[in-house]
Amino acid sequence: MQQFIFYKKENYLAFTKTRTSETKLGEKIQAISNEKKWQDELKKSSAKFVLIGIPEDIGINANLGVGGAYTAWKSFLNSFFNIQHNQFLKGDSILLLSLLL
């Protein structure tokens, strides 16, 4: 699908700062392994939550604000992937699907 940029596990592990005594969400989050069969993988996934990045700042610009929010996706990933995986927020219950263009 041309509108999606799919993330592979090795792509987003670059956002994760690992430590020996901690497990981060970025180490546990599920990924799509076959871009051509992403819909089948999504159906079979055990994830409760699916992340899709949508870079836009239309609302901000429409309200005469300062644009630039479309760049926030990478900052979000950098922060989100480094949250600790724990009993309340389990990384394996999340699937990072893609960035929507």
Task: Give residue spans per PLM region.
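Metal-dependent C-N hydrolase catalytic cores
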Residues: 2-101
